[in-house]
Amino acid sequence: MSLLATLGLELDRALLPASGLGWLVDYGKLPLAPAPLGPYEVLGGALEGGLPGGGEPLAGDGFSDWMTERVDFTALLPLEAPLPPGTLPPPSPAPPDLEAMASLLKKELEQMEDFFLDAPLLPPPSPPPPPPPAPSLPLPLPLPTFDLPQPPTLDTLDLLAVYCRSEAGPGDSGLTTLPVPQQPPPLAPLPSLSRPAPYPSPASTRGDRKQKKRDQNKSAALRYRQRKRAEGEALEGECQGLEARNRELRERAESVEREIQYVKDLLIEVYKARSQRTRSA
């Protein structure tokens, strides 16, 4: 309510002339509002029949108390000290110069452009080196065969023995003829040692695959022929059984047909005999 009263007083002061403002209350001479009381003090004053702050209850209804309520207008005064009359307020800070800011921004952009233009261009990245080739196993080479040299023939010894025998003559028995050494038989060449390849050659592998495929085709064709032969034999046996059943049914039908014909002939004879009897009677 105090705020409404203050606004009303300010409005009246602004609207009324200066001569009619003598009855207004001086804000500075109003007494200060009492200090706020604690909850126990308010409760004690209410129990004793008085108002908080030692005041006495006002006469009249409860809606007219705000008209006589004391208001502290010091809380509405500005916190800053009022300026003396004739002094100007401090100048507000000047707004930033837009042209100066634009020029600074343009300079920064030019510096950045010069920096990027002066920077050396990086060479294009070199392509990655090709991966090393996979290690391949060398093909096994056959081991070389070593042929032992043949021992030299002893032709020279044979000639020496013949020469000594001719020099000695037939009557000289003091010299003994040297035995002719026997030539050793030639050594047989060693068999070549060849170890098997660690893996089959591609040609043999391809041939094995073809042979395996051919065997599979032969076995599949054989199974197909056997299955068809079994199915044909089963169908043939069923056909023979049906033919035998058909012959049996045909014989029974023929016998029934003969019986029917016999009955017909019998009925015809009975009819003829009866007609003759009626004529004679």
Curated annotation (Swiss-Prot):
Modification after translation, per record: Ubiquitinated by CDC34 and UBE2B in order to be degraded by the proteasome.
N6-acetyllysine PTM sites in chain numbering: K29
Residue ranges of the region described as Disordered: 118-152, 166-236
TM spans (from-to): none
Region (Basic motif): 209-229
Coiled-coil region: none
Positions with biased composition (Pro residues): 121-143
CDD domains in the cross-refs: bZIP_ATF4 (cd14692)
Pfam families documented for this protein: bZIP_1 (PF00170)
Role summary: Transcription factor that either stimulates or represses gene transcription through binding of different DNA regulatory elements such as cAMP response element (CRE) (consensus: 5'-GTGACGT[AC][AG]-3'), ATF5-specific response element (ARE) (consensus: 5'-C[CT]TCT[CT]CCTT[AT]-3') but also the amino acid response element (AARE), present in many viral and cellular promoters. Critically involved, often in a cell type-dependent manner, in cell survival, proliferation, and differentiation. Its transcriptional activity is enhanced by CCND3 and slightly inhibited by CDK4.
Assembly: Binds DNA as a dimer. Interacts with PTP4A1/PRL-1. Interacts with CCND3, but not with CCND1 or CCND2. Interacts with HSPA1A or HSPA1B; the interaction protects ATF5 from degradation via proteasome-dependent and caspase-dependent processes. Interacts (via C-terminal region) with NPM1 (via C-terminal region); the interaction leads to loss of association between HSPA1A or HSPA1B and ATF5 and promotes ATF5 degradation via proteasome-dependent and caspase-dependent processes. Interacts with NLK; the interaction stabilizes ATF5 at the protein level in a kinase-independent manner.
Name of the protein in question: Cyclic AMP-dependent transcription factor ATF-5
Organism name: Rattus norvegicus
